[in-house]
C-alpha cells in the first residue's frame, strides 16, 4: 500500500501534469471505485477545472472549481497516469477523466480497492477515514507531548500503534519497521511502556524518515510508480523492512522477521530488545 511518501510523490507529479485542466468527459469503467452515485459524480465534475491537489495522510484531495473536492484513496495498488485521450485504455484502468486539451487522467488499480468520493470543499474532514486522522508527521503539527499522551493510553504493540492513523497520519508497514529500527525499539514493545526519551526519538525519526523517503520519490517494493511511471528510490536505503537475514547495519546481527498484528515485521533482535 502506498504510504505518505509515495502518495505525496504522486501528488507532486500530478500537480505538474493536470493542474488547471478542464474535464470534458468522465468514463467510469469500474463503478465500485466511485463512492457517490456514478451519474451524479460525472455530472458534477464535467466542465470543472482542477485548481489544486492536496494530501492528507494517505489521501489525495483534488480541488476543483465550484468548491468541489474529490477524495482519492489509492489503497493497495492504485495509480494515476496521464495519457492522450485517444490512446487505448490499459487493462485495470477504472476511471478516465478526459480533458478539453486532448489528454486524460487515468486511474489504474489491479486490486480494485481504491475509492473516489466527491464532496463539497470543506466537508472532506467529516468523511470516514479523514475525520479521525492524526497529525501530519511534520515539526509544527506532530507535537511530542500529544504523541506521548496517545501512546500512554495504549497497551498494544508500538508497531500496531504506529499503523493507527488516528495517532499519526501516513505511516504504513514499511516505514513503521524503519523508524522502529532507527529508534532501537522492539516492534512488540507495549506503546505505553516507552520512556519519554524513546517517544521523542521515535517522533523525530518518523519526521526525518518520511521526509527522506519523500525526497527519494518513495519506496518501490513490488509495483509502486509515480504519475510519470517512475519507480521510487528509497528501497535502496531501507535498514530493516524485507531485509530478513541481512546483517544489521549497526551491529551485524541478522535481521529477523516476525508477525505483529498480522503484519510481517522486520527488526534487529540485538538492537531492538522487547520490553515486557
Swiss-Prot record:
Keywords: DNA damage, DNA repair, DNA-binding, Glycosidase, Hydrolase, Lyase, Metal-binding, Multifunctional enzyme, Zinc, Zinc-finger
Name recorded for this polypeptide: Formamidopyrimidine-DNA glycosylase
Subunit: Monomer.
Residues annotated to bind DNA: 92, 111, 154
Chain's role: Involved in base excision repair of DNA damaged by oxidation or by mutagenic agents. Acts as a DNA glycosylase that recognizes and removes damaged bases. Has a preference for oxidized purines, such as 7,8-dihydro-8-oxoguanine (8-oxoG). Has AP (apurinic/apyrimidinic) lyase activity and introduces nicks in the DNA strand. Cleaves the DNA backbone by beta-delta elimination to generate a single-strand break at the site of the removed base with both 3'- and 5'-phosphates.
Gene Ontology process terms (BP): base-excision repair
Bilayer-spanning residue ranges: none
CC cofactor note: Binds 1 zinc ion per subunit.
Annotated active site: 2-3, 58, 263
Superkingdom of origin: Bacteria
One Pfam family in the UniProt entry: Fapy_DNA_glyco
ZnF segments: FPG-type: 239-273
Amino acid at each position: 500500500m502506498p504510504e505518505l511518501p509515495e502518495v505525496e510523490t504522486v501528488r507532486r507529479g500530478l500537480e505538474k501534469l493536470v493542474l488547471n485542466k478542464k474535464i470534458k468527459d468522465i468514463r467510469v469503467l469500474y463503478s465500485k471505485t466511485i463512492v457517490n452515485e456514478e451519474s451524479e459524480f460525472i455530472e458534477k465534475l464535467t466542465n470543472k477545472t482542477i485548481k489544486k491537489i492536496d494530501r492528507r495522510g494517505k489521501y489525495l484531495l483534488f480541488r476543483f472549481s465550484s468548491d468541489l473536492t474529490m477524495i482519492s484513496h489509492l489503497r493497495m495498488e492504485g495509480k494515476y497516469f496521464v495519457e492522450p485521450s485517444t490512446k487505448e485504455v490499459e487493462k485495470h484502468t477504472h476511471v478516465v477523466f478526459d480533458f478539453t486539451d486532448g489528454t486524460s487522467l487515468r486511474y489504474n488499480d489491479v486490486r480494485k480497492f481504491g475509492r473516489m468520493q466527491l464532496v463539497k470543499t470543506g466537508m472532506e474532514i467529516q468523511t470516514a477515514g479523514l475525520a479521525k486522522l492524526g497529525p501530519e508527521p511534520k515539526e509544527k503539527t506532530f507535537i511530542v507531548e500529544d504523541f506521548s499522551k496517545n501512546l500512554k493510553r495504549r497497551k498494544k504493540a508500538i508497531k500496531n500503534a504506529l499503523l493507527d492513523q488516528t495517532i499519526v497520519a501516513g505511516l504504513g508497514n514499511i516505514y513503521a519497521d524503519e523508524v522502529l529500527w532507527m529508534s532501537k525499539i522492539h516492534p512488540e514493545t507495549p506503546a505505553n511502556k516507552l520512556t519519554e526519551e524513546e517517544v521523542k526519538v521515535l517522533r523525530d525519526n518518523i519526521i526525518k524518515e518520511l521526509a527522506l523517503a519523500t525526497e527519494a520519490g518513495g519506496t518501490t517494493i513490488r509495483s509502486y510508480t509515480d504519475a510519470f511511471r517512475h519507480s521510487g528510490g528509497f528501497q535502496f536505503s531501507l535498514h530493516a523492512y524485507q531485509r530478513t537475514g541481512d546483517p544489521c547495519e549497526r551491529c551485524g546481527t541478522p535481521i529477523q522477521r516476525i508477525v505483529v498484528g498480522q503484519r510481517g515485521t522486520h527488526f534487529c533482535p540485538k538492537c531492538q530488545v522487547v520490553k515486557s
